[in-house]
Every structure is written in structure tokens, then in C-alpha cells.
Amino acid sequence: MTKSRIIITNDQDEVIGHKDRSAILPEEIYRVAALWITNSNGDILLAQRQLSKRNDPGLWGPAVAGTVDEGETYDSNIRKEAEEEIGLNNIRTIKSKKRRYAGEHNYFCQWYTLAIDKTADEFTIQVEEVEQVKWFSRDELAKELRDNPGNYLKGLNWAFEEL
């Protein structure tokens, strides 16, 4: 299996190169695509990262997220990740905001939204990536982000406020 190379950008999100994921330097900027999924009740689906993940194990984040690989676009990546991580295919997402995150990891995140009515059990999760998925009401998630921020990926609070 070959290692994937990810896109490296400048601070304007223009591609300046590609690197093996393991060789990324702290100051280098890469691309991520993330998907907010809601249902007709206004609930929000979150995914808990697999406990064995190197980065942020066990933390809750958007239903789908992935680092954009060489040869991919934000759009193609989010469709691929939705199918791989939670078994959704042929989806029609709506492109939302793009945000730059800077800190321990430096990346641009292109957010997408999707409305779908399924129970948490109806999603086919990729066990190597996702521990579980769960629907949260907006009020429940707001309370969780306020009371237990350490259980959630950094930046999720900002993204939730923009949703």
C-alpha cells in the first residue's frame, strides 16, 4: 500500500506542493474537507474518532472529515470520505464556509452541509476511522461544547456557531 501524499498550500490556499502525510512540518498548511449532517428535526450528527487514531483519539467531530490528498479537490474528497467513513454515496452536499485553522495543525477546512434522515444505526461506519456516530440536538451540543470542550475537536465550537 502506498502512502498518500497530501496537498500543501500557501496562506491563500493555493497549491504549492505535495508531501507524505508523515513529513508535514508544523508550519505547513494543508487542506481538510468536513461535513455537517443534520436531520429534519434539526439534530446534528457527530462522529467520535477511533480510539486508536494518532491525532485526537476519541474526540467528537463533524460526521465526516478528511485530509485532501494529491489529485483530489475539496469536493471529491468529501464525497469519498462520506462513503468510506459512514457509508453514504451519491450525496448532494452544499458547500458552506472555508476557514483557516492555525495552531498545532495548520489547515484550511472547507465545510459542507447535508440533510438526511437516518438513525445512527443506519450508517455503516469505517471502524478504522470512526468509533461511533451519534445525533445531538442543537441545545444538547451547545451545552456539551460549553461544559465538556475537551471531548470535542478544537474549532468545532466555532464551526457549530456558524452552522
Describe the function of each predicted region.
Residues 1-34, 40:
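Acidic, metal-coordinating catalytic segment for phosphate/diphosphate chemistry
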Residues 12, 39-42, 50, 115-120, ...:
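Short loop segments at secondary-structure junctions
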Residues 19-20, 58, 70, 99, ...:
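Nudix hydrolase/Nudix homology domain
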Residues 26-27, 53, 102-105:
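Short glycine/serine/proline-enriched coil/turn segments at secondary-structure junctions
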Residues 27-29, 55-60, 134:
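A short, polar/proline- and glycine-enriched secondary-structure boundary/capping micro-motif
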Residues 34-64:
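A glycine-rich, hydrophobic loop/mini-helix early in the fold
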Residues 45-46, 61-96:
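The catalytic Nudix box helix
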